[in-house]
C-alpha cells in the first residue's frame, strides 16, 4: 500500500514515515524538498499517483487566528481536491485534543481543518492527540534569555512516535470520522515539563508559568487540553522519553509501534 505523508519532514512526519515503512508499506513524502508545495498544490498530482491514503501532519507555528485558519484551510483544500482527482480513498488528519473547546488562534485553524476533512470529498479520519513530549523542548527553545516562559496549562503529553503509529494504524483501518482521542499516560503542568527538559539539557534558568489572557487562557489552565473521555493511551512516560535522550533530540525516528511500545487502549 502506498501512503503519502504531508509534512513528512517534521517531528511527527518523520515518525509517521518510519511507521509506514516499518509496517511494510511505501511512504511518499509530500514536502517542498520533494518537489511538492502544499500551499499552491504544485507537484501534488504527480506525487499522489497510486496513493491509497494520505496522512496530513503539516503544521504552522503561528498563534494568530487568521493565519492559522488560512494555512490549514489552504493546505487541506489543496490536498482534498488533489486526492479526489487521484482517486485516493482515505485522508487522515492529525489534530489536537481541546480543539473543540479552546478558542485559541492556532486551535481555531485546526478546528477549521477538522471541519473540512470531515465534510470533504474524500473519506476522512481525524485523530486528536495531546501535546507531544517534544513540545516542552520547543517552548524552551523560543526563549534565549535568562528566563523561559511556559503557558499555564495542564497537559497529558504523548510520545510523537506513538501518535505516529496510531495515525498509520488508522490509515490502514479505513475511514473512521472523528477517532477517539489519544493521550499520554500522565498529567502535568506544562511549566514542569519545560523545567525537566531544561535540567536535562544542563540549563538552570527559571521557567515561569504565565496564564494566557481571556477565555482561551482560562480553558488551558482549567484542563481544556486534557482528553474529554476514555480512549487510547500511550505508554511511554515523559521521564522515559527524557532518559532516552528526548531533550537533546537524540531519540530516533519511529520504526513502527515496537520502537516505543504501542499505544494501548
Short names for language-model regions:
Residues 25-86, 96-101:
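NAD(P)H-binding glycine-rich loop region in Rossmannoid oxidoreductase-like domains
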Residues 125, 138-158, 162:
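A conserved pocket-lining segment of Rossmann-fold NAD(P)-dependent short-chain dehydrogenase/reductase
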Amino acid at each position: 500500500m502506498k501512503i503519502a505523508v504531508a509534512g513528512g519532514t517534521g517531528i511527527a512526519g518523520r515518525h509517521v514515515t518510519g511507521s509506514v515503512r516499518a509496517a511494510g508499506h511505501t511512504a511518499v513524502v509530500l514536502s517542498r524538498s520533494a518537489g511538492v508545495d502544499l500551499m499552491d498544490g504544485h507537484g501534488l498530482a504527480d506525487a499522489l499517483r497510486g496513493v491509497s491514503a494520505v496522512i496530513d501532519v503539516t503544521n504552522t507555528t503561528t498563534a494568530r487566528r487568521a493565519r492559522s485558519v488560512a494555512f490549514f484551510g489552504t493546505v487541506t483544500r489543496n490536498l482534498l481536491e488533489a486526492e479526489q482527482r487521484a482517486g485516493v480513498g482515505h485522508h487522515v488528519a492529525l489534530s489536537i485534543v481541546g480543539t473543540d473547546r479552546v478558542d485559541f488562534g492556532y486551535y481555531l485553524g485546526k478546528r477549521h481543518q477538522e471541519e473540512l476533512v470531515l465534510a470533504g470529498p474524500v473519506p476522512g479520519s481525524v485523530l486528536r492527540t495531546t501535546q507531544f513530549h517534544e513540545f516542552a523542548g520547543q517552548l524552551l527553545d523560543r526563549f534565549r534569555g535568562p528566563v523561559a516562559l511556559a503557558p499555564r496549562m495542564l497537559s497529558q503529553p504523548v510520545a510523537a512516535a506513538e501518535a505516529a503509529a496510531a495515525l498509520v494504524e488508522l490509515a490502514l483501518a479505513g475511514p473512521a470520522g472523528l477517532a477517539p482521542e489519544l493521550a499520554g499516560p500522565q498529567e502535568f503542568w506544562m511549566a514542569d515539563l519545560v523545567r525537566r527538559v531544561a535540567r536535562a539539557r544542563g540549563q538552570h534558568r527559571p521557567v515561569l508559568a504565565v496564564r494566557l489572557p481571556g477565555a482561551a487562557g482560562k480553558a488551558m489552565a482549567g484542563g481544556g487540553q486534557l482528553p474529554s473521555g476514555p480512549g487510547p493511551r500511550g505508554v511511554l512516560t515523559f521521564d522515559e522519553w527524557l532518559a532516552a535522550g528526548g531533550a537533546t533530540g537524540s531519540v530516533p525516528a519511529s520504526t513502527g509501534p515496537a520502537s516505543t511500545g504501542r499505544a494501548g487502549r
